[in-house]
Amino acid sequence: MSANQNPSVQEVLGEVLGPWSDNERLKRESHFLRGTIEQDLQDRITGGFTADNFQLIRFHGMYQQDDRDIRAERSKQKLEPLHNVMLRARMPGGIITPHQWLAIDKFATEHTLYGSIRLTTRQTFQFHGVLKPNIKLMHQTLNSIGIDSIATAGDVNRNVLCTSNPVESELHLQAYEWAKKISEHLLPKTRAYAEIWLDGEKIEGPDEEPILGSNYLPRKFKTTVVIPPHNDVDVHANDLNFVAIGENGQLVGFNVLVGGGLAMTHGDTSTYPRRADDFGFIPLEKTLEVAAAVVSTQRDWGNRSNRKNAKTKYTLDRVGVEVFKAEVEKRAGITFAPSRAYEFTSRGDRIGWVEGIDGKHHLTLFIENGRILDFPGKPLKTGVAEIAKVHQGDFRMTANQNLIVAGVPADQKPHIEQLAREHGLIDDGVSEQRINSMACVAFPTCPLAMAEAERFLPSFVTEVEGILAKHALPKEENIILRVTGCPNGCGRAMLAEIGLVGKAPGRYNLHLGGNRNGTRIPKMYKENITDTQILQEIDELVGRWASERLDGEGFGDFTIRAGIIEEVIISKRDFYA
């Protein structure tokens, strides 16, 4: 039954899933995502959005948040929480010009509570702490420099990721162009964004959403374009992945992987992280048809009764991978060919300079946790702005929360490097362990956080560095370490060799068994333990790894081979077993 027939009870392929959730009512009654957002903007009594609009602003790229550090104190003073919004920009492939950067730097400085720019695992930037009177200004500022935030949140296709530094080869450039095409093709067609935020003309006549449908998707949907052997975008964290296949340096098509995703719910074993399934190879000319077919199949078959089981990964496990694949073939008018050979060998960013095929140079800057701010002794935000004032190329935000200064002519290299060093953007002493560690935002702004992540990680990494040194591991050795403040998985801990998932303040679930190239899900090793206990466990395990490992064996592979943790092969069967 089509998702757009709005039945009171959802039935898919003869299976009754149950009554539609209230989120489906909300979307159906929203007048194509307009709701009463405009009226809420005029309400100065509260700093927040009310009722359905609290959810609807997500489709416009925003989440309502507050400062949890001061929530209790404001409550004592009989004040409402300090409501504000976080905005996530739509930047397919993560490319931003120096002109655009200077504009977002200025807005962050003048109109946000925290003054920072946050690079994210979705290869874009976020503003945190934008108060209601500044929201419309924010959208209009972004629009004036060619940026929007349409569909970076909500039940739609989110920001499309692409392997970083697409000018490094002709293949990269072609793949980036496809990331942009896919993003545009799957974008909502409603005029609500322009009408509300950009004072666009209200055009009479019905809106139509030919791909997403009038109720949009059952849940968020994430898409990537990845260029092997580099898996920087973590394909298995995403619903739909196009793995670039090249011949003689030219892109000829994609292997299509469907059904990845990392979010879960503590205590609910019907939720689990899952690897994507390989559907097969398609030629380039079928890319947009296949993208639309996967999205529309999930639109019609995804669970609209239970949002915890609404993502594509659960649809595949419910109806069967082959059944889903056959429906995609039918809708796209193709037959998947056998997948072409490829291999992932790495996923971290190459910090420092690399030279492109065009003779220009690219400098990847390590930005710890993606937070660009002027820290004591490390004025990172000022430094990037100073580079933007003289840089002739562009910037590339990476899915590892770092920043690439791309397209630097040889004669500009010394000046760019000097600016980077003067502002703490280059640190020759940063360890491989720190470079390969990552956290989501969590406290104080994320309302879903159960434990610290971004503020916790730097000191925790220092402790892990000490453990590696204690066991005489070489300096270039590292463990893929990720921390996420809740089980929703923004920090992609469920593809790490060591993954920490927040359970309560100061407590985490410890997961082991992922691998370095991001193709294995880690399994829970210890539940609800403190950071001190986690470090004790890591110390013991690293000691064994240092003395027992095979030549070149990564930590995650060692934990599987040594029987410390069982391998997750089929998530539905193995993750909780």
Curated annotation (Swiss-Prot):
Siroheme binds at residue 490. Pathway: Sulfur metabolism; hydrogen sulfide biosynthesis; hydrogen sulfide from sulfite (NADPH route): step 1/1. The gene is cysI. GO terms for molecular function: 4 iron, 4 sulfur cluster binding; heme binding; metal ion binding; NADP binding; sulfite reductase (ferredoxin) activity; sulfite reductase (NADPH) activity. It catalyses: hydrogen sulfide + 3 NADP(+) + 3 H2O = sulfite + 3 NADPH + 4 H(+). It comes from the Bacteria. Keywords: 4Fe-4S, Amino-acid biosynthesis, Cysteine biosynthesis, Heme, Iron, Iron-sulfur, Metal-binding, NADP, Oxidoreductase. This is Sulfite reductase [NADPH] hemoprotein beta-component.
